[in-house]
Amino acid sequence: MGEVDPAFIQALEHRPKLQTSFAQGIPLIDLSPLINSPEPSQQLVAEIGRACQEWGFFQVINHGVAVKARENIESAARKFFALPKEDKKKVARDEVNPLGYYDTEHTKNVRDWKEVFDFVVRDRSLIPASPDESDDQDQVKELINQWPEFPSDIREVCEEYAAEMQKLADKLLGLIALSLGLERTRFNGFFDDQTTFIRLNHYPPCPAPDLALGVGRHKDAGALTILAQDDVGGLQVKRKTDGEWVLVKPTPDSYIINVGDIIQVWSNDKYESVEHRVKVNSEKERFSIPFFHNPAHYTWVEPLEELVNDQNPAKYKPYNWGKFFSARKRSNFMKLDVENVQIQHFKNHTSLPNTE
């Protein structure tokens, strides 16, 4: 990635400002009470609920994730991305198997300034064979992890890290369920045959950080994202109060938690997924590792019945997660003539009474 190809250049209204402020007041939630007591306090549950409602994301500390597991996967990522391009492309992903290495991903039809390596947490995960709604959703294909020869321990460290992330995700989903007034285990069944995946991100230095983005503006399609970022920083979120893009300052040994679109739908818009993007740096490379927690491909996503009533009717029509996921994956490979599928496409629009 030398000169800036026009494919990377953002439309004028979406270009990042070189000077942006760090966000103030981002919730920083201490999970250490869960270490000593399996039952979370009402205070902790309320903190989680406020963060999901007011920000759509938060940071956690004292989360119980083994420090060594994170250090190992970060080291493996650096070693892998330092390989020659031809070696990385030996495990290149494609439309048939969207796992492995890729360096031409698009977000909202603009190319991202990054390279990635993806693997599923549950090897041989199933997704629909076709993203098209008209095609049979029972026709499925397997997602099979591709592992490079170097670093030699990459599979082992990735699987160890995935197990740590799974434990943290279970804790967080339990807290979010409680904050919505639901049973703590309410979400568990959706993830029995999960399509969760982990991504290793590498953002090389960019000669034109005012024109390109590491990842363009987007919301996460799944249920929950757990992000480990290095000390370089670059993650920006769109603040709900004023619509400004603000930087998330890296906090040592913390994780950033994003509410995804699925939780927005399950909560019937009580919680909202946050729009975010990644700035690039002209001098420093950046690494990050998101864990995208996704349900089984056969899940129909809709507002939960406990949260819907005559006063608060369902704001979304049900949609099939596997089809949604497959369609979003397809858009990563090519520029589309139409906007990529969004949860807004499934909104129930209440018609106004006819006054004529």
Model-derived segments and spans:
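Peripheral, non-catalytic segments flanking oxidoreductase cores
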Residues: 1-356
